[in-house]
């Protein structure tokens, strides 16, 4: 009838009548009133007729600005009616309170018990809120490209482009977004709460946990390793069953694609029971006491509100098939870093042939998902400082990916420190030049020099100093593909005095730069020291000999090179060696470190030299030396012909 009355007003405006004429109760024609059988009452003004009392339904307002309407049957309680609506949104009745909204005075609400008969509330409006003392945190997702090695917390697969919660650090793929738990634990706030056990009210007005729970959580946190206590370390506490939250009410004003998670939006919030938090913090510890929760009463939760009807066991059950042995123990997520996935169990690697021994370790050929090279380092009983420094360097080595670099595959720490790299079938450059005396052509020697400079340029771009650049560590793989190995690992190539790292001359004498031999600086190793070693390799390529072959005394070589009295004899370079290569060898072997070029300049010089080399193009008129197969079957008699008579 209101629409009809509005229509009459519209018509009246067309005839210049006043709107006040139609405002009274008698403005409608009696004919219209009789036809519709409806007469407007003063009590109906501004109120839509409520049909909920006749349809046995209750309107419920839920957290996160959601609402629903539930059907009521006889004998059902509020818990029974609202259980499904709460479950699909990832909520628990034990962490919520239900209120009945009172019309007068407006905004007042009366708390109800979950066991209240729902039939007595038909037609009423209810509101479900979180309990005030429930520690509540919401997700804050942001799109992120993980430049460092990362794995999805849901599918445990490699993660490059995905999302991460800025609060708890939970990271996942886009296609795994539907499985992200709704609970978000801000561990920095929890630890801040644990630091003040005597405060009853926090800054946000949230009551603190009871002393018993505080003490247990504080004991658990005290056992957390320091390495895992950072703001984004989040253990795998999402072990409870949560349904996927409905998309209704979770999108922004501009509806987005359902295949993309909402970025910078608060997800459906899951209240955090302190029992879950206590179990989560206990997961951080490797040696958590199994009876940490045995003293909790069964009828009350640690925070004081009533527990679910199902009693909670005092000790969490182990998953079937779990083993207490250390090798099968699954580490908590908060304790894992990306290096964990690169550690190889010693029992998985089978060593076979001993390849050789060097200054820093022994190399073996082994089997680990195929042929690998295992270098067992000469580090006996590493100190915690050495072990941590070794892990830091491994974190750098595992990021190296280049065609001219030996592929790093993992490391081992049990019994001895060892690194595992790809296996190179070819021999080292040293063996080719000085043992087998392989005869390379000049363009092949220049290409080997180019590939070596290319690999070293990559390492220096990664801020990795080789420290032991020599022909023994350059391998020719599957033909003439250069592979550089044994790079980095300053921890192994240095001497330790207690917990302090002391630099010492490392590498072979013939390839050591003069400043490294002198050891006058605190850290003589630099990009230029690698360039000097590379210059010695160029000298080997262009002469086929080792430098200082006329000096047989090792100490004399150290003294003369360190003082600058001796340098490689460049007159022994091959006669057909290009002049540009001769200049490059001389520049790399400069006695003053600052005068040596860096590898970007070296690489560009060699590439320019390669392009300038003369190439003999095949003549177009030259016949092919490879005859077709059918020509071999031609009989010589077919080529003879009868002599024709001459007229």
Curated annotation (Swiss-Prot):
Enumerate the UniProt keywords alphabetically.
Answer: ATP-binding, Cell membrane, Cytoplasm, Kinase, Membrane, Metal-binding, Nucleotide-binding, Phosphoprotein, Proto-oncogene, Serine/threonine-protein kinase, Transferase, Zinc, Zinc-finger
Q: Where are the zinc fingers (Phorbol-ester/DAG-type)?
A: 138-184
- Tissue expression notes: Isoform 1 was present in all tissues tested: skeletal muscle, intestine, brain, gizzard, heart, lung, kidney, bone marrow, spleen and bursa of Fabricius. Isoform 2 was only detected in brain, heart and skeletal muscle. In brain and heart isoform 1 is more abundant than isoform 2. In skeletal muscle isoform 2 is more abundant than isoform 1.
Gene3D superfamilies annotated for this entry?
3.30.60.20, Phosphatidylinositol 3-kinase Catalytic Subunit, Chain A, domain 1, Phosphorylase Kinase, domain 1, Transferase(Phosphotransferase) domain 1
Any one Gene Ontology MF annotation carried by this entry is:
identical protein binding
Which cysteines does the record link by disulfide bonds? none
Q: Which GO terms describe its cellular component?
A: cytoplasm; cytosol; Golgi apparatus; mitochondrion; plasma membrane; pseudopodium
Which residue ranges does the record assign to the RBD domain?
Answer: 56-131
| Enzyme Commission no | 2.7.11.1
Catalyzed chemical reaction(s): L-seryl-[protein] + ATP = O-phospho-L-seryl-[protein] + ADP + H(+); L-threonyl-[protein] + ATP = O-phospho-L-threonyl-[protein] + ADP + H(+)
Identify the stretch(es) annotated as Disordered.
236-269, 284-334
Q: Which SMART domains match?
A: C1, RBD, S_TKc
Which sequence positions carry the modification called Phosphothreonine? Answer: 268
The protein's name:
RAF proto-oncogene serine/threonine-protein kinase
Compositional bias (Polar residues) at which positions?
Answer: 239-269, 298-309
Question: Where in or outside the cell?
Answer: Cytoplasm; Cell membrane
The chain residues annotated with the modification Phosphoserine are 43, 259, 338, 499, 621
Which SUPFAM superfamilies did the record assign? Answer: Cysteine-rich domain, Protein kinase-like (PK-like), Ubiquitin-like
Q: Where does ATP bind?
A: 355-363, 375
Q: Name all Protein kinase domain ranges.
A: 349-609
Task: Please give the family membership noted in the entry.
Answer: Belongs to the protein kinase superfamily. TKL Ser/Thr protein kinase family. RAF subfamily.
Source organism superkingdom: Eukaryota
Q: How is it modified after translation?
A: Phosphorylation at Ser-259 inactivates kinase activity. Dephosphorylation of Ser-259 by a complex containing protein phosphatase 1 relieves inactivation, leading to stimulate RAF1 activity.
Composition-biased stretches (Low complexity): 286-297
Biological function: Serine/threonine-protein kinase that acts as a regulatory link between the membrane-associated Ras GTPases and the MAPK/ERK cascade, and this critical regulatory link functions as a switch determining cell fate decisions. RAF1 activation initiates a mitogen-activated protein kinase (MAPK) cascade that comprises a sequential phosphorylation of the dual-specific MAPK kinases (MAP2K1/MEK1 and MAP2K2/MEK2) and the extracellular signal-regulated kinases (MAPK3/ERK1 and MAPK1/ERK2).
């Amino acid at each position: 009838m209101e629409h009809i009355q509005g229509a009459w007003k519209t018509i009246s405006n067309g005839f210049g009548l006043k709107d006040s004429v139609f405002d009274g109760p008698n403005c409608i024609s009696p004919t219209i009133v009789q036809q519709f059988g409806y007469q407007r009452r003063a009590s109906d003004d501004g109120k839509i007729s409520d049909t909920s009392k006749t349809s046995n339904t209750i309107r419920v307002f839920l957290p996160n600005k959601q609402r629903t309407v539930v059907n009521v049957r006889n004998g059902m309680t509020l818990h029974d009616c609202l259980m499904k609506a709460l479950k699909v949104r990832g909520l628990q009745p034990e962490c919520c309170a239900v209120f009945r909204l009172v019309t007068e005075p407006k905004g007042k609400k009366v708390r109800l018990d979950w066991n209240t008969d729902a039939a007595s509330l038909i037609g009423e409006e209810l509101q479900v809120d979180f309990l005030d003392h429930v520690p509540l945190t919401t997700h804050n997702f942001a799109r992120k490209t993980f430049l460092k090695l990362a794995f999805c917390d849901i599918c445990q697969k490699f993660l490059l482009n995905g999302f991460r919660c800025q609060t708890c650090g939970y990271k996942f793929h886009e296609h795994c977004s539907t499985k992200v738990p709704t609970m978000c634990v801000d561990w920095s706030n929890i630890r801040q709460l644990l630091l003040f056990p005597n405060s009853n009210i926090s800054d946000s007005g949230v009551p603190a946990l009871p002393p018993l729970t505080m003490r247990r959580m504080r004991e658990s946190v005290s056992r957390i390793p320091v390495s895992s206590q950072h703001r984004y370390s989040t253990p795998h506490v999402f072990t409870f069953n949560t349904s996927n939250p409905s998309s209704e009410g979770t999108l922004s004003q501009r509806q987005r694609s359902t295949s993309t998670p909402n970025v910078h939006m608060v997800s459906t919030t899951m209240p955090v029971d302190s029992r879950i938090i206590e179990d989560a913090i206990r997961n951080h510890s490797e040696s958590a006491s199994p009876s940490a929760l045995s003293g909790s009463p069964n009828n009350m939760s640690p925070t004081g509100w009533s527990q679910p009807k199902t009693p909670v066991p005092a000790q969490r059950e182990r998953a079937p098939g779990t083993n207490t042995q250390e090798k099968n123990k699954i580490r908590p997520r908060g304790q894992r870093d990306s290096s964990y996935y690169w550690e190889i169990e010693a029992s998985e690697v089978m060593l076979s042939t001993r390849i050789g021994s060097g200054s820093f370790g022994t190399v073996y050929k082994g089997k680990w998902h195929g042929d690998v090279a295992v270098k067992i380092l000469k580090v006996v009983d590493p100190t915690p400082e050495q072990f941590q420094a070794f892990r830091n360097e491994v974190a750098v080595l595992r990021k190296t990916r280049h065609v001219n670099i030996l592929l790093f595959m993992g490391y081992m720490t049990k019994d001895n420190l060892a690194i595992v790299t790809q296996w190179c079938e070819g021999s080292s450059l040293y063996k080719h030049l000085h043992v087998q005396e392989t005869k390379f052509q000049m363009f092949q020697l220049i290409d080997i020099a180019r590939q070596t400079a290319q690999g070293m340029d990559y390492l220096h771009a990664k801020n990795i100093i080789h420290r032991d650049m020599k022909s023994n560590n350059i391998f020719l793989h599957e033909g003439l593909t250069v592979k550089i190995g044994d790079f980095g690992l300053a921890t192994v190539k240095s001497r330790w005095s207690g917990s302090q790292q002391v630099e010492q001359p490392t590498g072979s004498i013939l390839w050591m730069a003069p400043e490294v031999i002198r050891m006058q600086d605190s850290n003589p190793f630099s990009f230029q020291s690698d360039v000097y070693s590379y210059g010695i390799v160029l000298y080997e390529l262009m002469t086929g000999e080792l430098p200082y072959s006329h000096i047989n005394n090792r100490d004399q070589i150290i003294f003369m090179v360190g003082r600058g009295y001796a340098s490689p004899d460049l007159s022994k370079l091959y006669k057909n060696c290009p002049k540009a290569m001769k200049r490059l060898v001389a520049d790399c072997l400069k006695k003053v470190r600052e005068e040596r070029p860096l590898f970007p300049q070296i690489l560009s010089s060699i590439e320019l030299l390669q392009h300038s080399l003369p190439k003999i193009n095949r003549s177009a008129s030259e016949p092919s030396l490879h005859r077709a197969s059918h020509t071999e079957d031609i009989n010589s008699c077919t080529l003879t012909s009868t002599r024709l008579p001459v007229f």
